[in-house]
């Protein structure tokens, strides 16, 4: 998976245009694999300028992996270094985990693989990642900074073949206005599509946080500990 167009956790997809323009321009760090520029950043486990991996993108994009109170945070900082307003109408973070069951027997799949369950609830949204065998901790991906879970978009450009045992990968979509005006046009959206406008010299950070629930049954309690709203259905409710 180290070739062009294969997505990894840490990639980013950005769709933008000059404010007032008509056509959206797409950029993805998966399109062509090139070296990123490491950055010195004391508060990060690793930091890099990703602009080179995004082709001719007019904005500066930096990525930070951080430890926040024992949790892993993936943050992207986008800065407008031009003299023009730019509107970011598509912003997605690929959620790449091992959900490919191809060529595996039941025992191997249960040992190696996971399945996802997204809740696209904006700032209350989250993605849970559980092992197929159902044991051990569950991974929860949560909004951390300006990263409401607005949509869950299939990454159809990833070359990994789809099959009855592999549904493909998806991205956590923070802004979906560009999608709603192009490939999703005419389709009712679960959440109102949004965008962000960056003025010259302005920057904005977007981050998700990865936390562990002790086990699947503790997911709701972990969400409460993370100060997230939780609704639990009980027998007989309507």
Locate each region found by the language model.
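Short acidic, flexible loop segments centered on an aromatic residue
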Residues: 89-100, 176-181, 224
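Short, hydrophobic/aromatic beta-strand segments
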Residues: 82-92, 219-220
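Catalytic cores of secreted or luminal carbohydrate-active enzymes
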Residues: 188-234
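Extended, loop-rich substrate-binding clefts of extracytoplasmic carbohydrate-active enzymes
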Residues: 13-75, 81-83, 87, 168-194, ...
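Acidic-aromatic substrate-binding/catalytic surfaces of carbohydrate-active enzymes
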Residues: 1-51, 112, 116-117, 124-179
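Extracellular beta-rich ligand/substrate-recognition surface
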Residues: 51-57, 106-108, 118-121, 131, ...
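Short aromatic-acidic-glycine turn motif
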Residues: 96-110
């Amino acid at each position: 998976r180290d070739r062009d167009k294969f997505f990894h956790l840490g990639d980013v997809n950005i769709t933008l245009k000059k404010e007032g323009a008509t056509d959206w321009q797409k950029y993805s760090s998966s399109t062509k694999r090139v070296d990123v520029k490491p950055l010195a950043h004391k508060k990060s486990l690793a930091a890099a300028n990703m602009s080179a991996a995004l082709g001719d993108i007019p904005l500066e994009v930096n990525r930070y992996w951080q430890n926040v109170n024992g949790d892993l945070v993936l943050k992207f900082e986008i800065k407008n270094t031009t003299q023009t307003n730019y509107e970011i109408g598509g912003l997605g973070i690929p959620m790449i985990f091992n959900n490919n069951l191809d060529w595996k027997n039941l025992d191997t799949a249960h040992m190696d693989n996971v399945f996802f369950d997204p809740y696209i609830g904006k700032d209350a949204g989250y993605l849970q990642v559980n092992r197929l065998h159902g044991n051990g901790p569950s991974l929860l991906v949560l909004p951390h900074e300006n990263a409401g879970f607005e949509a869950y978009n299939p990454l159809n450009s990833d070359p990994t073949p789809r099959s009855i045992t592999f549904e493909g990968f998806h991205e956590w979509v923070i802004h979906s206005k560009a999608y709603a005006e192009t490939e999703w046009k005419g389709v009712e959206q679960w959440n109102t599509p949004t965008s962000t406008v960056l003025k010259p010299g302005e920057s904005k950070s977007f981050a998700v946080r990865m936390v562990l629930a002790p086990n699947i049954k503790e997911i709701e309690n972990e969400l409460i500990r993370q100060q997230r709203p939780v609704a639990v259905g009980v027998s007989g409710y309507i």
